[in-house]
Amino acid sequence: MARHSFFCVDGHTCGNPVRLVAGGGPNLEGSTMMEKRAHFLREYDWIRTGLMFEPRGHDMMSGSILYPPTRPDCDVAVLFIETSGCLPMCGHGTIGTVTMAIEQGLVTPKTPGKLNLDTPAGLVAIEYEQNGQYVERVRLTNVPAFLYAEGLEVECPDLGNLKVDVAYGGNFYAIVEPQENYTDMEDYSALQLIAWSPILRERLNEKYKFQHPLLPDINRLSHILWTGKPKHPEAHARNAVFYGDKAIDRSPCGTGTSARMAQLAAKGKLKPGDEFVHESIIGSLFHGRVERATEVVGQDRTLPAIIPSIAGWARMTGYNTIFIDDRDPFAHGFTVA
């Protein structure tokens, strides 16, 4: 019997939780972060479930673990953990991780105000604004984002037939826009969106293939992005992003905002240099920007893409030393359907 101890820094990004594991993470094998992610999922997934699931976490919990970088052009590597698994990239998680890591002295940047993160999805460039000991704002330049498919049909309980676009912004997103059987996220409760989303995701993954052209391990749709008209005067659009099994992102979602900008750019509604302010279900904002156009060249297809950036803020809420005790029947956590 053993008691495993994890020292965590807890916080939130624009309302969505981030648990940064600053001590106790396992040593991982692999020459890339995607390989290390696979090793973690294979042998240490109990750490993820123990820290993210009840009774130590909850349905919306997400987090990260810091590692030395696997590539010379990066300052630090990040493994993202959440209730649904280990995401290749997490926008709100990145903003929270950078904020807390800088404020707590866990990372020493080579250039003040800038960081390069080694993530399973690739290099993520960071610029941050610091006021004394506090990080006030973080802007991440994300991996290439692209529109993957348009007008995919799927049957939704209660609503009926829906058409969705699927875009990639670090994860694959089904984007539900206003149409005959769907009006606006404001017209439905969060509980309804939570009930419908996993069914849509399962049906879409069964009916269609989603494969990143360059990253073989990214091969399924994981998120549903419900759109709506903004309430905040600065925002261009509003969204409710479903992830995991029962969670609606409280932040505007970084990879979701990246995917949304890629979709709009592919349809001629955004161009390089354009700003896109995205509002969350609780009214917090991410400030997105199309940095430049690019393309993703795979063996079978070449996709027009953008390099998006996302800016937001995070706040630390406290320190947390968490035990995962082998004597505990709920050592590895649990979820309630």
Curated annotation (Swiss-Prot):
E.C. code: 5.1.1.8
GO terms assigned for molecular function: 4-hydroxyproline epimerase activity
Residues annotated for substrate binding in this entry: G91, H92, H223, D249, G254, T255
InterPro entries registered for this protein in UniProt: Pro_racemase_fam
Cystine bridges: none
Positions of the catalytic residues: C90 (proton acceptor), C253 (proton donor)
Catalytic activity: trans-4-hydroxy-L-proline = cis-4-hydroxy-D-proline
Alphabetically ordered keywords of this record: Isomerase
Family the UniProt entry places it in: Belongs to the proline racemase family.
Role played: Catalyzes the epimerization of trans-4-hydroxy-L-proline (t4LHyp) to cis-4-hydroxy-D-proline (c4DHyp). Is likely involved in a degradation pathway that converts t4LHyp to alpha-ketoglutarate. Can also catalyze the epimerization of trans-3-hydroxy-L-proline (t3LHyp) to cis-3-hydroxy-D-proline (c3DHyp), albeit with 170-fold lower efficiency. Displays no proline racemase activity.
UniProt protein name: 4-hydroxyproline 2-epimerase 2
